[in-house]
Amino acid sequence: MNAIVEQLKSTADATKATDIRAAFAADSQRFSRFSVSLDDLLMDFSKTAVNDDILKLLVKLAEEGGVEKKREEMFSGKAINFTEDRAVLHTALRNRSNAPVLVDGKDVMPDVNAVLAAMGKFADDVRSGTLKGATGKAITDVVNIGIGGSDLGPVMATLALAPFHDGPRAHFVSNIDGAHIADILKLVQPETTLFIVASKTFTTVETMTNAQTARNFIAKALGEAAVQHHFAAVSTALDKVAAFGIDSARVFGFWDWVGGRYSIWSAIGLPLMIAVGPENFGKFLDGAHAVDNHFRKAPITENLPILLGLIGFYHRNVLGYPTRAILPYDQRLSRFPAYLQQLDMESNGKGVTIDGTPVEGNSGPVVWGEPGTNGQHAFYQLIHQGTSIIPAEFMIAANAFEPELRHQHQLLISNVLAQSEALMKGRTFAEAKKQLTDKGMDDKKADFIAPHRVFTGNRPSITFVYDKLTPYALGRLIALYEHRVFVEGVLFRINSFDQWGVELGKELATGLLPVVEGKESAASHDSSTQGLVAALAKLAK
């Protein structure tokens, strides 16, 4: 595999990483040759540096790197998360074919379907008003309390599918900063609010601290006996859930083979299901399942997740681009970049290979972004003219949900297309100077000003086009990126499914709490930490 990477680097050097502008000028069919589709979902990667030779090498890289073999190991239930001895089967949660999926010889689909059915019944009862609060009033607000994968997925998807909301209002609390839950509690009434506490172990400090605040909110207003009527849980720690005061009939479980950042398809998606209904949640699963089938069956040259992963690897480990920008031209996808940030960086932000040796080259990039067109008036300046090349990934629906605002959607489309074209084409000195002289500027001044209006161009982007942001389309988009991250992880030769860096932070915070509370000395910590503790303590008084 290393030999192929070196070949890719040599090819990139020989072609100067492909002059994308020249490639379009020389090939009128470049778009059709370097774009692939899955039904209405189109992925255009013609505005990247990929050419025929590079694509052949990337395909060979996937073959020799074991992408297809590792893919089947994942789907078959092998414990590919070897540092925790766990299978990786979030795909089973959206296995709409209901074909058996085995973990340690046991078919998990009956359990998956049982939890999904229980979620559906509970969601319907909340939405219809059958399930009421302690005083007999229907639930009007649902507050999900979780963090990380128990928050980012539900927040992102619930916002993305706002046009499909016909259930109670949805709110989300994640940060241990008391301001977060305090602000949410100002928006809801105890008698008509349901809290969902999402924590597999029911020990996550942030989640349980916020859950206790919510419990006090209910108990103070309605009495201790009311707690059971206003809480549900997504957890496997039944004893701890019971001790908290939540009825076992309102507890929904999931499994060790579901990683937090892949858990939106599980009971963690309960607040989304309550917001949009079980039928739409089912369509969300359908979209992801369609991508799973495509990922398993399509040849590499037509396989969206594999191609996306190969291009991502090429950008990171061949061309050395350190970041990627996620730029959805859809305001309702405003949390999608943050969702992908966790998915990608928590999965592939590793420095050790599966053999326990240091990663050669780079592992995952920094992932960031904002929705268009907002980003155009913020950081696109750097993408266009900065010294770092930042691959951009655009997303745009052909149709919006507001037919009366069609003109605004057309403006949105024109902006995203203009940005991808501008990144590729740029503007030469001669073009910039002519633009200035055409406006009446004298030649000498134009020579001075023109360099500031030059855009180098040749900056890569991928554009995704789809019909409309439906539950099916969203499920498809998320699964596409999940599998992309998997492919890149295989090529980086890392375990994409553990997160020991997250665990380290938890350990250190737990150890520092007694120091912050003034119960223990800070002497065992470094001088910076000691100084910060002292400064904060002084201000707190």
UniProtKB/Swiss-Prot annotation:
Q: Which GO terms describe its molecular function?
A: carbohydrate derivative binding; glucose-6-phosphate isomerase activity; monosaccharide binding
| Protein's pathway | Carbohydrate biosynthesis; gluconeogenesis; Carbohydrate degradation; glycolysis; D-glyceraldehyde 3-phosphate and glycerone phosphate from D-glucose: step 2/4
A Gene Ontology biological process in which this protein takes part is:
glucose 6-phosphate metabolic process
Catalytic activity reads: alpha-D-glucose 6-phosphate = beta-D-fructose 6-phosphate
The main place the protein resides is: cytoplasm
Asked whether the UniProt record includes Metal-binding among its keywords, one would answer: no
Q: Which residues form the active site?
A: 346 (proton donor), 377, 506
Highest taxon of source: Bacteria
Q: What class of enzyme is it?
A: isomerase
Q: Spell out the Pfam families in the cross-references.
A: PGI (PF00342)
Entry annotated with the keyword Cytoplasm: yes
EC number annotated for this UniProt entry: 5.3.1.9
Q: Where in the cell is it found?
A: Cytoplasm
Q: Which UniProt keywords apply?
A: Cytoplasm, Gluconeogenesis, Glycolysis, Isomerase
Looking at the UniProt record for this protein, which Gene Ontology cellular component terms does it annotate, in alphabetical order? Answer: cytosol
InterPro entries attached to this UniProt entry: G6P_Isomerase (IPR001672), G6P_Isomerase_C (IPR023096), Phosphoglucose_isomerase_CS (IPR018189), SIS_dom_sf (IPR046348), SIS_PGI_1 (IPR035476), SIS_PGI_2 (IPR035482)
Q: What does this protein do?
A: Catalyzes the reversible isomerization of glucose-6-phosphate to fructose-6-phosphate.
Q: What protein family does this chain belong to? A: Belongs to the GPI family.
Kindly provide the name given to this protein in its UniProt entry: Glucose-6-phosphate isomerase
